[in-house]
Amino acid sequence: MTAEGLLQILLYLGLLAAVTPLLGRYMARVFEGERTLPGIVLGPLERGLYRIAGIDPAREQHWTGYTLALLSFNLLGLLLLYALLRFQALLPLNPAELGPVGPDLAFNTAVSFTTNTNWQSYGGETTLSYLSQMLGLTVQNFVSAATGIAVAVALIRGFARRAGKTVGNFWADLVRATLYVLLPLAFLGALVLVWQGVPQNFDAYVTATTLEGGNQVLAQGPAASQIAIKQLGSNGGGFFNVNSAHPYENPTALTNLLESFYLLMIAAALIYSFGRMVGDTRQGRALWTAVFILFVAGLAVTWWAEAQGNPAVTALGVETTDGNMEGKEVRYGTALSALWAVATTAASNGSVNAMHDSFMPLGGMVPMLNMMLGEVIYGGVGAGLYGLLVFVILAVFIAGLMVGRTPEYLGKKIEAREIKLAVIAVLVFPLGILGGAALTTVVPQMLASVQDPGPHGLSEILYAYTSATGNNGSAFAGFGANTPWHNTGLGLAMLLGRFAVIVPTLAIAGSLVAKRAAPAGPGTLPTHGTLFITLLIATILIVGGLTFFPALALGPIAEHLSLTAGTLFGAVP
């Protein structure tokens, strides 16, 4: 752990804290229908889109109508992307003449990008045409992120409105999130990436001669435009196989800062937007502080674990003063690799600038735990906020039980219906993660994908189904996921982790929006102070994390203890 690494991390955290209120205020204005500067240019385009689609943005929807519109839109997007992947060999912009994507892989990929997961059981430059990357994946990067923002905004309205019947208009929220938030920021990010050397072309692949005299194929393509939105929209799927560890995706220190900052920017700002939209910025600051504490704690553990190096390597007499550098870019080192790993799993992003499978056991456990907690530590674009508010509901319920009062939040009584729906949303994660991992260990065809023995093999299984259920998309690379069994199983886990959380969340919004707000009384728990922040952190860790402790004890914790004791596990025969 070096002073240079600490300064880099402090710069990142300072930028995040500085931009949060600025972007948060802007997004609150966008979704409250107020005038904004980009609206001068984009307003006519927005109104034109409504006219073409026959949408009246002022006609709001009941939560059931909002949910039906969302599910229909995402189903259509999934089917169109599946068809595009299956028929890409017949379509233009395929200079490498890549064939059609197989049915199980096409299903997995279509589900992955529709659910904002971006799990990739393939290498982008060897599997997908330029058209598939642009028209298929990049489009879904925008609309899946906009879908998450729309759900978060609908839930905010549930808390903010009084005795209402509607939670907004899904189509209007989708368009505004795309036009006013995602598109401008992605455009600016893409310009910076092109400036720094990221490819943005339609050229054929280039064959180059290496210093040893051999040939190497250099992939090309419209990468910058996809990379910008995959970072910004908490998508994460790389244009190239090794994601942002590839020098074409992440060539300089500036691109590394920009891409890692884009990981959390919108998710952090949406928490501030929540405070603005409910009329009490203290509420947003309290939630932001809680997740900031969890984020910094996880980052500290990960960086410490990686900076210590591998004791098995040290025992061989190898110099390890730079820490555990296996699977890492030398230009970024342990500090920036740990920062990215924690940020990408705190958000539901999943992009990487280092290989998580090569992290030390505890260093790899923190990213896994971030996802197991429901990715509410800032979380994905929109998804992080509505997941966090589900835990807020559980926290005030627990507080109400302790003092013997009906729980309430922002004046809205939290009753049996909201608690049941919140519990359903929380139970999705252990069902998908532990259920998928258990199935993998007992089905021989699925277990064959595990390439490492012992505790690390279990960690690879856990990480895969945690990433899929949490809609993250990162992976421990020792897990061979491109099989019909896992393409199907992981695809189902992604669908479960996305829509089995969204539906109860929107139901909570519909229930809350109909309630009147009661004034705070002498027994009301203040939800903007230190006590509530502590209670919320405890709820996230205990309710969200304790379920997974036995699995973590058998995986990364057991691996850490074995490694410390000098016990190693051989390769799978």
UniProtKB/Swiss-Prot annotation:
<dbReference type="InterPro" id="IPR004623">
    <property type="entry name" value="KdpA"/>
</dbReference>
<feature type="transmembrane region" description="Helical">
    <location>
        <begin position="489"/>
        <end position="509"/>
    </location>
</feature>
<keyword id="KW-0633">Potassium transport</keyword>
<feature type="transmembrane region" description="Helical">
    <location>
        <begin position="179"/>
        <end position="199"/>
    </location>
</feature>
<feature type="transmembrane region" description="Helical">
    <location>
        <begin position="383"/>
        <end position="403"/>
    </location>
</feature>
<keyword id="KW-1133">Transmembrane helix</keyword>
<feature type="transmembrane region" description="Helical">
    <location>
        <begin position="3"/>
        <end position="23"/>
    </location>
</feature>
<keyword id="KW-1003">Cell membrane</keyword>
<feature type="transmembrane region" description="Helical">
    <location>
        <begin position="136"/>
        <end position="156"/>
    </location>
</feature>
<keyword id="KW-0812">Transmembrane</keyword>
<dbReference type="GO" id="GO:0008556">
    <property type="term" value="F:P-type potassium transmembrane transporter activity"/>
</dbReference>
<dbReference type="Pfam" id="PF03814">
    <property type="entry name" value="KdpA"/>
</dbReference>
<feature type="transmembrane region" description="Helical">
    <location>
        <begin position="531"/>
        <end position="551"/>
    </location>
</feature>
<keyword id="KW-0630">Potassium</keyword>
<feature type="transmembrane region" description="Helical">
    <location>
        <begin position="254"/>
        <end position="274"/>
    </location>
</feature>
<keyword id="KW-0997">Cell inner membrane</keyword>
<dbReference type="GO" id="GO:0005886">
    <property type="term" value="C:plasma membrane"/>
</dbReference>
<comment type="similarity">
    <text>Belongs to the KdpA family.</text>
</comment>
<dbReference type="GO" id="GO:0030955">
    <property type="term" value="F:potassium ion binding"/>
</dbReference>
<feature type="transmembrane region" description="Helical">
    <location>
        <begin position="423"/>
        <end position="443"/>
    </location>
</feature>
<keyword id="KW-0813">Transport</keyword>
<comment type="subunit">
    <text>The system is composed of three essential subunits: KdpA, KdpB and KdpC.</text>
</comment>
<feature type="transmembrane region" description="Helical">
    <location>
        <begin position="65"/>
        <end position="85"/>
    </location>
</feature>
<feature type="transmembrane region" description="Helical">
    <location>
        <begin position="286"/>
        <end position="306"/>
    </location>
</feature>
<keyword id="KW-0472">Membrane</keyword>
<comment type="function">
    <text>Part of the high-affinity ATP-driven potassium transport (or Kdp) system, which catalyzes the hydrolysis of ATP coupled with the electrogenic transport of potassium into the cytoplasm. This subunit binds the periplasmic potassium ions and delivers the ions to the membrane domain of KdpB through an intramembrane tunnel.</text>
</comment>
<keyword id="KW-0406">Ion transport</keyword>
<protein>
    <recommendedName>
        <fullName>Potassium-transporting ATPase potassium-binding subunit</fullName>
    </recommendedName>
</protein>
